[in-house]
């Protein structure tokens, strides 16, 4: 499996969205940039903010699309073209309703599962053959409550759990960057004793 070269966090831009559950992907790449000392800069040709990070001996591009969640594919595909990166070398971090807060899961390939940022990316790529980091935000219990749930802020306990999941995913990332995606999955998916 190809080593990762681009890590994208999905979210909505602007301070009013900064702490929402839907911005779990932004939270991941922001934490990654902070841990590595990478600095964000606006890149209008890529429709987002970019940073260059050094992680475990690998140079990786970070991207936060500024297009709003539903149009994330525009920024992602522009970055893939500009940096000549294959979709298989892409990791997209996003919020996941079907996972409890405190849970993060890596996967490769698949559908969008109702996540509109993934939906747009898959539509523009023509396939779903890229890596994903699913950051659990929990489900409100009924589909009619999903929109206010994802656009709302998590309570203190859930917010702490999401932060722990982000940290665990960052800790597993060097394995994925080395091309050992299955080992990274095993590390992240195995409960700590």
From Swiss-Prot:
EC class: hydrolase
A biological-process GO annotation: protein quality control for misfolded or incompletely synthesized proteins
InterPro entries the record matches: Pept_tRNA_hydro, Pept_tRNA_hydro_CS, Pept_tRNA_hydro_sf
Marked site positions, Stabilizes the basic form of H active site to accept a proton: 95
Reaction it catalyzes: an N-acyl-L-alpha-aminoacyl-tRNA + H2O = an N-acyl-L-amino acid + a tRNA + H(+)
Pfam family, one: Pept_tRNA_hydro
Example GO molecular function: peptidyl-tRNA hydrolase activity
Protein origin, superkingdom: Bacteria
Main location (coarse class): cytoplasm
Residues the record marks as site: Discriminates between blocked and unblocked aminoacyl-tRNA: 12
Residue numbers binding tRNA: 17, 68, 70, 116
Catalytic activity, EC: 3.1.1.29
Gene3D superfamilies in alphabetical order: Peptidyl-tRNA hydrolase
Cell location: Cytoplasm
CC annotations in GO: cytoplasm
Signal peptide interval: none
Functional description taken from the UniProt entry: Hydrolyzes ribosome-free peptidyl-tRNAs (with 1 or more amino acids incorporated), which drop off the ribosome during protein synthesis, or as a result of ribosome stalling. Catalyzes the release of premature peptidyl moieties from peptidyl-tRNA molecules trapped in stalled 50S ribosomal subunits, and thus maintains levels of free tRNAs and 50S ribosomes.
UniProt family annotation: Belongs to the PTH family.
Protein name from the UniProt record: Peptidyl-tRNA hydrolase
């Amino acid at each position: 499996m190809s080593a990762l070269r681009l890590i994208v966090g999905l979210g909505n831009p602007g301070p009013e969205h900064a702490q929402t559950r839907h911005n779990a992907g932004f939270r991941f790449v922001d934490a990654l940039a902070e841990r590595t000392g990478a600095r964000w800069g606006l890149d209008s040709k890529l429709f987002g903010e970019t940073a260059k990070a050094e992680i475990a001996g690998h140079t990786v591009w970070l991207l936060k699309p500024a297009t709003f969640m539903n149009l994330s594919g525009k920024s992602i595909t522009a970055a893939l073209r500009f940096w000549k990166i294959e979709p298989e070398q892409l990791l997209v971090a996003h919020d996941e309703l079907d996972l409890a807060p405190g849970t993060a899961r890596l996967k490769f390939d698949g559908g969008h599962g109702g996540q509109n940022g993934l939906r747009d990316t898959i539509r523009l790529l023509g396939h779903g053959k890229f890596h994903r980091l699913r950051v659990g935000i929990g489900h409100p219990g009924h589909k009619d409550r999903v929109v206010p749930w994802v656009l709302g802020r998590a309570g203190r306990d859930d917010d702490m759990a999401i932060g722990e999941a982000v940290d665990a995913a960052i800790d597993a990332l060097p394995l994925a960057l080395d091309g050992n995606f299955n080992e990274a999955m095993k590390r992240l998916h195995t409960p700590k004793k």
